Each structure stands twice: as C-alpha cells, then as structure tokens.
Amino acid sequence: MARIILSLFLLLLAPLCHADARTDPVGPDKVVYHLNAGLEQAAAGLEYVRNHLEANPKAQIVVVAHALGVDFLMKGAKSARGNAFAQAVEDLQLQGVRFRVCEITLRERNLRREQFLPELEYVRSGVAEVGRLQQREGFAYLRP
C-alpha cells in the first residue's frame, strides 16, 4: 500500500519537478544598432528597432550613431517622407532605448551638442562603443 501511495505521489509531483531552462521564451535581448549612413538608414533603423520591441518588449537596445548617422538626432531632422525624427526617438527612449552619439563625429563635423535632441548620451568614439558593447557586454550587432 505504501508503494502505491508513493507511486501516486511521485506521479502527481513529476510535472512540478520538470524544470524548463527557458521559462520565458522571449528573454531580454541585448542589441546594438549601428547607424552611420545618413537619414535613409536611420529611418529604416528606427523601424527595425520598433519592430524589435514589438516582438520582444524586454529587449535592451542601444543605438550608436556616428559619421552621417548622427544627422537624424539633430533638432529639426526629417525623413525623406517629411516625418520628424524627434518624436520617434522620444517614443523609443520612453521604451528604454538608449541613443549614443560619437563625439569624434561632432568634432570633425564642427557640430555642437546644443544642435541635438535632448536626452542623448555622448561617447568618445562611436565605433569603439559598438565594439565595447559587443565584446565586453555581450550585445548582438545589427546594422540596417
């Protein structure tokens, strides 16, 4: 009788003991989006970021901009369709996306921080930041 009770107990307990390593199939991705080719690339890149967050709202996303890639982060910047980038950037920031701007680009292009949208982060080198995020922090690399 004791064996039957033990067997039933183990049978009932078995489903609870099954441990799935992926209890959340959509975990927090860590992704760096690399933008360096102007407004067209930026428009596509922001759309990709929106899609990424729709698929995985927990994603940790950093957008690193340098060279012509900083242009969309300037005050008054608009896409080829005439849409202001400022609102899209602000919406993504509210979802936790971080935007980092290359200070070398600013220096070489004679640009000032005052010309850019608020709440941006500035890094010494955009390229070095992309490498650092990949190598040291385990971010996946995406370039639209």
Region spans (language model):
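Mid-chain, structured segments of secreted extracytoplasmic proteins
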Residues: 62-111
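Sec-dependent N-terminal signal peptides
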Residues: 4-13
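N-terminal secretory signal peptides
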Residues: 20-64, 68-72
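Stable alpha-helical elements in mature extracytoplasmic
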Residues: 41-48, 81, 85-88, 98, ...
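C-terminal partner/receptor-binding element of secreted or periplasmic proteins
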Residues: 118-144
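N-terminal signal peptide c-region/cleavage motif recognized by signal peptidases
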Residues: 14-18
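Active-site-proximal beta-strand/loop segments in catalytic clefts of secreted hydrolases
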Residues: 35-38, 64-68, 103-105, 125, ...
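Structured segments of extracytoplasmic/periplasmic soluble domains
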Residues: 48-56, 91-95, 105-109, 123, ...
